[in-house]
Amino acid sequence: MLKSVCMKPFASMKLPTLTVRILSTLCALTMVGLAAQAQLLYKISGKDLTRPSYIVGTVHVVSSSFFPQIVGIDEAVNTTDCVVGEIDFKEALSQDFLTRVSEAMMLPEGKTIRDLLTAEEMKSVNKALMSVTGADFDNPMVMAQMGRLTPAGLSNTLTLMLCMKHYADSFNPNDLIDLYFQKVARENNKATDGLETGEEQMRLLFGQPMEKQVRDLVCLCEHFDRAQQDLEDMIAAYKNQDLKRLGEVMDQQFLEGCSDGPQDRQQLVVDRNRRWVEKMPTIMSAQPSLFVVGAGHLAGDDSVLTMLRQQGYVVEAVER
């Protein structure tokens, strides 16, 4: 079913549930470098905590079937009372939020993607779109369905289609690992929460100047084969729980990929880490919690783990 969707134009402009959330986070994640570490799960204790909390790194396009392979995850889930994601999916799946996201992804009435790109840039976009759908913007149906997407919205949609085409047997945007953690929490009558609000994420991911959105879209399309290879390498490294290799892939993407360099990293990673670490002590003091965030936020001198240690917490890798 997923394969058939990605091999033909969308039947409507209603994007699949979670599309924006999943891919926006993936785009941010691919800009982040990681240190040479080999664990996905960390225990947080010490300071004023009477019971430990945990934090686990994910790659957001990996399915929930990988969940039991994370070393130590059962204990982390069973001994915590709340699962805290980057966003609370109760909000992300609400009709109000999905409507606002759809609006944020659309150009003003009367404008289309052709109005923003040169003829040569449109050729690059059409080539990428053709490779994952079998059609492009020269097809009136595709233009009617997707032509009003903002450049950022189109970048995210193309990345989703790439996942759907190359991981058709395992990729399901409604059965991804981040969502699964919160689903398990709800099934066990545990609380869920988010480190960011939907509004914060929309501003971050769809509030960029139009010139930057265009630049990022064109770069993605001009290097679409590279994007596919990076995605494959990233997922393979994560499933091997090889954060060293994952870091190498992401570092290379950060240095050579479609990024504005340190400015993007500061905004998408470092500033967010600081805001999260400001919120985490209150959450952990209230109840032991399991934090679920992109793996790129868990390593380096300005990572969430480093910042927690600087606040006096004991942060230990959960090993076999």
Language-model features: locations:
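Bacterial N-terminal signal peptides
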Residues: 21-33
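Structured, acidic catalytic/metal-binding patches in enzyme active sites
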Residues: 40, 46-54, 59-267
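Boundary at the C-terminal end of the N-terminal hydrophobic targeting segment
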Residues: 35-38
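Bacterial N-terminal signal peptides that target proteins for export
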Residues: 5-24
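Short hydrophobic "helix-edge" motifs at membrane interfaces and signal-peptide entry regions
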Residues: 25, 47-49, 283-285
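A cross-kingdom marker for long, charged
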Residues: 259-320
